[in-house]
Regions:
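Conserved nucleotide-sugar phosphate-binding/catalytic loop shared by glycosyltransferases and other
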Residues: 8-12, 30-78
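Short amphipathic alpha-helix
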Residues: 14-26
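Conserved nucleotide-sugar donor-binding subdomain of glycosyltransferases
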Residues: 64-93, 100-101
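A donor-sugar binding/catalytic signature common to diverse glycosyltransferases
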Residues: 94-100, 105, 115, 235-274
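A nucleotide-sugar donor-handling region in carbohydrate enzymes
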Residues: 124-190, 211
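Donor-nucleotide binding loops and adjacent catalytic segments primarily
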Residues: 166-241, 291
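Catalytic binding pocket for nucleotide-activated donors in carbohydrate/polymer assembly enzymes
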Residues: 251, 255-306
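C-terminal amphipathic helix plus adjacent low-complexity
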Residues: 299-348
């Protein structure tokens, strides 16, 4: 069986999840990966057969999106051409992690697909939302990458078709310890802005992961680290707590480890506002932006008790098994053909 796995690379979380899922997917057949986007800073060992700039989100230095850069990189002509060229018809199963070009290709070629990931959970109105819903944000969540079928992941099973997060095997196998430091990953804030706040709580040690350094450096109570999946995982396992955005993968892993968590959602990104609402229901402090006295919030939060660890109803193996069963139900009785020459339209 041939499987196309389309992965959104607008952030590191999608990449991390794909790396974790790949060995399980490969038990069912040959897996080719379509990597779309250019805002992930993690090196990847994924078997990338097709690669595109996709539609990427870019962040500013003070907690929000960089709309100008996003507009500069956007090309509807390129997206249309790549969707026409992507050979989705050559695969038995198409699994889509919120990737718009694959979704469009499946529409053009009448190919069934399954959306598997966190964004699929927002097909349900029972998934938490902020007090003020945004029409455009809701439309994007439900229409940016449509599929034939949906398999959602979230912090809680809010509805049928929504399941627990995929947690990395290294984290599941780990014994969490508390070595006193706080692990920090805030891709939407600059090193300078983060440093200004963390230096004001000298009694707490921080391990900050940022794209702005290539080697480990220490500045007073802050250890700056280059972005690394293994390094970040180890730091989080050994931390007293985690400060991060209101994405999905990192907060889910921190909650699974029973770590204290404080989240700063990316301004203007509706999905993160939805996640923030869900995290607040779980008792996680959410700070709308890094204000002038954020360091005071950190000091108070650091002394709070750790939460009860998040429980998983299904293992990664079981989740993939369910996804494949759901995807197989979409398969036509006829077999797929051979790959065509449209691969030349994609950069590898």
């Amino acid at each position: 069986m041939k499987i196309l796995y389309a992965v959104q690379a607008t952030g590191n979380g999608h990449i991390s999840r794909a790396v974790e899922l790949l060995p399980y997917l490969e038990q069912y057949g040959q897996v080719d990966v379509f990597l779309s986007g250019e805002n992930s800073h993690l090196p990847t060992s994924l078997p990338v057969k097709y690669k595109s700039r996709g539609v990427s989100l870019f962040y500013g230095n003070r907690g929000g999106l960089n709309y100008f850069k996003m507009w500069q990189k956007f090309s509807i002509k390129r997206i249309w051409k790549e969707a026409k060229a992507l050979p989705v018809e050559d695969y038995d199963i198409v699994i889509n992690d919120f990737e718009c070009i694959t979704s469009l290709a499946c529409k053009f070629k009448n190919k069934p697909s399954i959306q598997f990931g966190h964004q699929a959970s927002f097909r349900s109105n029972l998934a938490p939302r902020p007090q003020k819903r945004e029409f455009i944000g809701e439309w994007i969540l439900k229409n940016y990458a449509t599929a034939t079928s949906y398999f959602g992941l979230h912090f809680n099973t809010y509805d049928n078709g929504i399941f627990n997060p995929v947690i990395k095997a290294d984290i599941i196998a780990a014994t969490p310890v508390n070595k006193g430091h706080v692990t920090v990953y805030l891709s939407h804030y600059s090193k300078k802005v983060i440093t200004n706040q963390l230096h004001k709580v000298p009694g707490i040690r921080f391990e900050v992961f940022t794209k702005e350094v290539k080697t480990e450096t220490i500045e007073k109570n802050i250890r700056f680290m280059p972005i690394s999946n293994a390094g970040f995982t180890t730091s989080m396992i050994e931390s007293a707590g985690v400060i991060t955005g209101a994405g999905f993968e990192t907060p889910a892993e921190a909650l699974y480890l029973g770590k204290k968590l404080i989240c700063l959602p990316i301004r203007g990104q509706y999905e993160q506002l939805c996640n923030a609402a869900a995290l607040e229901q779980l008792g996680v402090p959410v700070v709308p932006k890094m204000h002038a006295t954020f360091f005071v919030d950190i000091a108070k939060w650091y002394d709070m008790p750790a939460p009860t660890p998040l429980k998983l109803e299904y293992s990664t193996y079981q989740l993939v098994q369910k996804v494949i069963e759901q995807a197989k139900a979409l398969m036509p009785s006829t077999s797929v053909g051979t790959q065509n020459e449209s691969l030349n339209n994609f950069a590898i």
